[in-house]
């Protein structure tokens, strides 16, 4: 059976209704029973409670919950309560960020027309769009939403905006004639689709599909079956949590074995090992990562990128492929006049000579044979027509003034079948001289002229004369060949071309279609939606950063390729293909070719998903931009879905991870830079936290091996983890951005946070902190270098160890600022948040160990000035030690 767009309107009626007659009431009822309501199916939604519970799936969070339970069993209710509060707060933050992530189907429903004009009992009546059924005849006019998919049976200049479905920016001129052969969605001119919008004309269509069977319904099905990808950070943190738990268990196992060998009871040894495991886990890590990402979202929002899903902030830093829409993202989304072809030569739009009669005549004609206007700064009408009046304004010629002086006395509206538009204007005064001069006759006041514009091939068949600098003469085949060649040249460069002609008519003549003959050819005007000024630089930065930019558009291949060449995405024509080519490829073949294709034109939603999957199957992290309903499934399939804030539909926004408030490709590149920096900063924060915890574990291990008292009370470790550690860790997450990161290739998606080099840094920091803390503990425990009356004690040793561990970690924050030795350079001062966190941390720890009255709260012995100086001095040594290690590592690596 033929597709409906391949059938005539009569064949379509017979195929659906069995005859050309409208549906009877009985047939309407039967069809409603058979096809159901014209509505999208309800998708299963997650409740807020489900979303909240999902926040506890991360492995590290599970470990923390177990740690809290163990702490409670051991009687350490303080630790258990703090841990549970921290992970609950983190879950609340995550829930707030994701609670709106599944609204796509709701937005699709909003696109449906609430009412439609349908033929019932021989008359068109308004009914709710949900009551429309297959076989109904629906009337459309300008301003209507199309309520269902259907075959056009009557067309009077119908123009439909299908950009939400096809991605094509310009309105589509509809045609009631059948189409031969296969045609992509955007080229099925005799069809209309649910969710599109009528911008001009009127028509009637036969409903062929409703509800989930419409093109929008198919997209809804794709959207509901498309699984969201986990971001690299989500996978990394999960992997990190598993590895961290294994490391902690290994250490605790060692400690348990040592304790048993020393003769301690197995039960006591086990409880001590579990307590150490609780202390080793960085309780605030999840919250710190969430807070750092939240700060990142605020910065990106100021730079026109709104993050809807928090983990996407970091995921941007892993992006290796950006699949971008063309219109409005890489281009300005505004048609602009590029060239004129008049009296046999091409002229750039800005170079029009207003004193040249032929050039001025073409400019006037384009503004008069034109229905667009500008009201309160808003352009009204077809984009190609607004481009024609905008260039006039730019050159100092007001369309309002010209239209007032050259009143329209008649018109033949544009018709997609004949592809022409004509107006009859009464032209007088100075303007009449341009036309009368062309006709080599005396100027006459109030002469009527027919001005015609349209497709080049159609207009050339209707002209018999041509305007030249020497006047009007008969047009020759050579003239037509030159005009056709110029049109071909414009088209090959992705330009949209209109031809203009005119002729003198009798005063008061009511124009008829037959009058569009024997015209005088005046010239051509080419237009395009030009690239954004910043697109070329942004594409170049992508390539430098090892990111592959890919254009995916519903527009024609020639237009897409021309833009892609201008901005650097496309170097060779072989790198461009159309959706029909993808249909001929298996998924495996597409994976093989995807590296070599930079431009995809005339693509469907299914094509977009296949393209994204092909890149993902090759191990890439893919960002996908889109603004239409047709983009939503691919946005959801992509690792990072990027919706347009200005032109984007609610559907695309709800399916996305990020929304661009300026619809600008350069903003995506800036967001990638932010993502890379945030990932680096999060690693610095993790390095800072784990170095300190590792140092604490080593100190406890040392004390256990040598049968010394436990150096730390539980309150000490909680104080450090939740107070003096959290703020520096957050501050490290706010380190200033480093532009040089955009000179590096994207990191592999499966790269673990805990690389060998990263573990070495954690180890070096932990050992350094351990040494300084152990020395402080021994000084206090044995009473070395202390006043005789103070003496040594386990409590003093514990206090000095606590103070040194805390201050060492505060100083270590400066070590973690960079992989390079920068502490003794000016860069140490470039993070005001870290300096503030250091100062606050120093105040808090000093109060805890030196303020009388707080000793019982923190289980310490109040220190005097000598002991304080010892603590500060030992802690500071951590900086030169780690900086020396970095310098040695850097020198070795340089060899």
Residue ranges and their predicted role:
Residues 1-743, 753-754, 767, 802, ...:
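Conserved cytosolic headpiece of P-type ATPases
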Residues 704-713, 779-797:
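Helix-coil boundary and interhelical linker segments in multi-pass alpha-helical membrane proteins
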Residues 724, 798-813:
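Generic alpha-helical transmembrane segments
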Residues 749-767, 792-800:
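Membrane-water interface at loop-to-transmembrane-helix junctions
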Residues 769, 773, 807-810:
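ATP/pyrophosphate-binding catalytic subdomain of soluble kinases
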Residues 774-786, 850-855:
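Membrane-helix interface motif
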Residues 816:
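A C-terminal functional module that forms or caps the active site or interfaces directly
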């Amino acid at each position: 059976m033929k597709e409906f767009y391949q059938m005539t309107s009569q064949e379509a009626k017979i195929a659906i209704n069995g005859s050309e007659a409208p549906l009877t009431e009985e047939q309407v009822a039967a069809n409603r029973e058979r096809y159901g309501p014209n509505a999208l199916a309800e998708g299963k939604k997650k409740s807020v409670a489900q979303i909240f519970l999902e926040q506890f799936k991360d492995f590290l969070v599970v470990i923390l919950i177990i740690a809290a339970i163990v702490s409670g069993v051991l009687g350490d209710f303080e630790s258990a309560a703090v841990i549970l509060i921290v992970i609950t707060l983190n879950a609340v933050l995550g829930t707030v960020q994701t609670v709106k992530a599944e609204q796509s189907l709701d937005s699709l429903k909003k696109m449906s027309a609430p009412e439609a004009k349908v033929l019932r009992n021989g008359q068109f009546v308004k009914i709710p769009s949900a009551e429309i059924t297959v076989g109904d005849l629906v009337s459309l006019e300008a301003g209507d939403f199309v309520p269902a998919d259907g075959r056009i049976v009557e067309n009077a200049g119908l123009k439909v905006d299908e950009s939400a479905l096809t991605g094509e920016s310009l309105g589509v001129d509809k045609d009631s004639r059948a189409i031969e052969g296969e045609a992509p969605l955007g080229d099925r001119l005799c069809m209309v689709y649910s969710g599109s919008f009528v911008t001009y004309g009127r028509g009637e269509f036969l409903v062929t599909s409703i509800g989930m069977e419409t093109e929008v319904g198919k997209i809804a099905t794709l959207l509901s079956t498309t699984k969201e990808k986990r971001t690299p950070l989500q996978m990394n943190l999960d992997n990190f949590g598993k590895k961290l738990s294994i490391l902690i268990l290994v250490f605790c196992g060692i400690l348990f074995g040592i304790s048993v060998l020393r003769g301690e009871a197995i039960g006591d040894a086990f409880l001590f090992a579990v307590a150490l495991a609780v202390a080793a886990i960085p309780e605030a890590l999840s919250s710190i990562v969430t807070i750092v990402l939240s700060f990142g979202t605020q910065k990106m929002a100021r730079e026109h990128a709104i993050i809807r899903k928090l983990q996407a902030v970091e995921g941007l830093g892993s992006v290796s492929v950006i699949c971008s829409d063309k219109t409005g993202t890489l281009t300005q989304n505004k048609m602009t006049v590029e060239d004129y072809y008049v009296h046999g030569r091409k002229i750039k739009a800005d170079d029009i000579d207003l004193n040249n009669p032929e050039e001025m005549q073409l400019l006037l004609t384009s503004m008069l044979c034109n229905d667009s206007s500008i009201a309160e700064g808003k352009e009204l009408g077809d984009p190609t027509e607004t481009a024609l009046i905008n260039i006039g304004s730019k050159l100092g010629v007001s369309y309002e003034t010209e239209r007032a002086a050259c009143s329209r006395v008649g018109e033949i509206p544009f018709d997609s079948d004949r592809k022409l538009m004509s107006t009859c204007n009464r032209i007088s005064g100075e303007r009449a001289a341009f036309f009368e001069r062309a006709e080599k006759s005396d100027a006459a006041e109030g002469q009527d002229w027919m001005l015609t514009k349209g497709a080049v091939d159609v207009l050339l068949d209707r002209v018999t004369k041509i305007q030249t600098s020497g006047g009007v003469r008969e047009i020759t085949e050579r003239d037509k060949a030159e005009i056709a060649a110029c049109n071909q040249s414009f088209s090959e460069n992705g330009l949209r071309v209109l031809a203009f002609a005119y002729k003198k008519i009798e005063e008061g003549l009511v124009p008829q279609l037959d009058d569009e003959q024997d015209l005088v050819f005046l010239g051509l005007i080419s237009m395009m939606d030009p690239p954004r000024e910043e697109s070329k630089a942004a594409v170049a930065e992508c390539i430098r950063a090892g990111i592959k930019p890919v254009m995916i558009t519903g527009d024609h291949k020639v237009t897409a390729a021309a833009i892609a060449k201008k901005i650097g995405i496309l170097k060779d024509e072989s790198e461009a293909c159309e959706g029909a080519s993808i249909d001929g490829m298996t998924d495996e073949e597409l994976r093989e070719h995807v590296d070599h294709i930079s431009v995809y034109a005339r693509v469907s939603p299914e094509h977009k998903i296949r393209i994204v999957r092909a890149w993902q199957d090759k191990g890439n992290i893919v960002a996908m931009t889109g603004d239409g309903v047709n983009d939503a499934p691919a946005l959801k399939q992509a690792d990072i879905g990027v919706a347009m804030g200005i032109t984007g539909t609610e559907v695309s926004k709800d399916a996305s991870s990020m929304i661009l408030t300026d619809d600008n490709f350069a903003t995506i590149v800036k967001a990638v830079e932010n993502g890379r920096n945030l990932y680096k900063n999060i690693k610095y924060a993790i390095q800072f936290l784990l170095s300190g915890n590792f140092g604490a574990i080593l100190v406890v291990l040392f004390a256990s091996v040598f049968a010394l008292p436990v150096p730390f009370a539980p309150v000490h470790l909680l104080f450090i983890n939740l107070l003096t550690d959290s703020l520096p860790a957050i501050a490290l997450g706010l380190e200033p951005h480093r532009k040089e990161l955009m000179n590096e290739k994207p990191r592999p998606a499966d790269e673990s946070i805990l690389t060998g080099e990263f573990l070495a840094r954690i180890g070096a920091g932990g050992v350094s902190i351990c040494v300084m803390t152990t020395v402080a503990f021994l000084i206090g425990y044995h009473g070395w270098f202390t006043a005789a009356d103070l003496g040594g004690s386990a409590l003093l040793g514990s206090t000095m160890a606590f103070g040194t561990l805390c201050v060492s970690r505060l100083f270590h924050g400066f070590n973690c600022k960079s992989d390079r030795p920068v502490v003794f350079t000016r860069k140490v001062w470039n993070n005001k948040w870290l300096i503030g966190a250091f100062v606050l941390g120093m105040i808090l720890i000093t109060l805890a160990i030196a303020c009388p009255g707080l000793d019982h709260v923190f289980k310490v012995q109040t220190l005097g000035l000598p002991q304080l100086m010892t603590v500060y001095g030992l802690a500071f040594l951590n900086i030169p030690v780690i900086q020396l290690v970095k310098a040695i590592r850097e020198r070795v690596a340089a060899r």
